[in-house]
Amino acid sequence: MLGIIGGTGLTKLPGLSVTHRQVIRTPYGEPAGPLTFGELDGHPVAFLARHGYGHTIPPHLVNYRANIWALQSQGVSHVVSVGTVGGIHPQLGPGKFCVPDQIIDYTHGRESTFAKYDGKPVVHEDFTWPYCQEMRLRCIAALHRAQEDFFDGGVYAAVQGPRLETKAEIDRLARDGADMVGMTGMPEAYLAREISLCYATVAVSVNWAAGRGDSAEAITAEMIEATLANVVDRLYSVLKHLACMDYDQELPVTPGGICDV
């Protein structure tokens, strides 16, 4: 089953025919809210609002472990994480979709592993490619089917938040190779890897990062909300195309290729 994690601007899923909501108790505390189960265009999905259904949980206080564990415990095998980002790359202006393929983690102090380190041998999980390639290709196929012009690949810089960045910080991220900046990409992606969820991100650029675009323009909540209002219907179309895919069978994936979904 497909799990959808909604970020800023997606605290509910338009068009979802809800069957039930369920509060999941986890060994890691409470998730951001109950899981919402239903059908999207006739296909089963589970939806979770990352920041809570009232958008009350800031990125550095999200219980990422509980969120990811809750989805997996209910039979979710594949996860698309929807997140807003600031565009650093010149092609990632407001309103542009992106399917990143790399992450640089600048966060700190977040619970970032399910491991207990209770005397058992330490396991070092490979994270060379932080996103599930199969799920990335599904996202790419869905964006093509929705006739979206999108950015394929790119480096997601995961920062602590909740404040936005300074121009100097964005300049540093750009020198490090980042194409976009967001606050929720880690440890979410790694936790999904630890428990074998096939996870990828569809990022939505809602503003130019500080100093990009019109560098004199301040980043305001109104600016971000206006962009979100313009992309919600487009995002819903992408998610419908994702929901209609078969998640009971693992797809053969060729690096750099589009699988038949």
For each feature predicted by the language model, list its residue ranges:
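His/Asp/Glu-rich mid-to-C-terminal helical/loop segments that flank catalytic regions of hydrolases
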Residues: 210-261
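Active-site rim beta-loop-alpha module in soluble metabolic enzymes
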Residues: 130-174
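Short acidic/polar active-site loop segments enriched in Thr and Asp
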Residues: 77-78, 179, 198
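Zn-dependent metallopeptidase/amidohydrolase metal-coordination segment
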Residues: 183-221
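Non-catalytic positions within long, well-ordered alpha-helices that form the structural scaffold/packing
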Residues: 72-75, 174, 193
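Generic hydrophobic/aromatic pocket-lining and core-packing "Φ" positions
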Residues: 68, 170, 186-189
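Metabolite-binding pocket within alpha/beta catalytic cores that recognizes anionic/polar moieties
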Residues: 1-128
